[in-house]
Amino acid sequence: MEKMVLRKVVLLAILLSLSCLWVAKALEGESKVSGQVRDETPHTWYCKYDDNCRENCPGCTITKCNYGVCICSNCYHQQSDLGVESHM
């Protein structure tokens, strides 16, 4: 009986340690994503159609040619693109 309880405790400890490792790995992934800077200011270029805006706004999730002007927003840039030094 004691061996069965001991096995269950060991199994529970292993599962708990694996879940902690999984959480730590997930948090590490979030820290890599936070290395990107989100640009909230819209950028504008002249355009004739939406494809021009996609070419001029790399990394932007919203691109639209509106009355001949590209509207680019929700843009993500690597910190190195913005002139910020990275010490990784």
Swiss-Prot record:
* Cellular localization per UniProt: Secreted
The signal peptide stretch is 1-26
A biological-process GO annotation: killing of cells of another organism
Protein origin, superkingdom: Eukaryota
Under the cellular component aspect of Gene Ontology, which terms does the record hold? extracellular region
Got any disulfides in this one, which pairs? 47-65, 53-70, 57-72
| UniProt keyword Mitochondrion present | no
Keyword Signal listed:
yes
Query: Which keywords fit this entry according to its UniProt record?
Result: Antimicrobial, Disulfide bond, Fungicide, Plant defense, Secreted, Signal
Q: Give the protein family.
A: Belongs to the DEFL family.
Q: What protein am I looking at? A: Putative defensin-like protein 264
* Upper lineage: Eukaryota, Viridiplantae, Streptophyta, Embryophyta, Tracheophyta
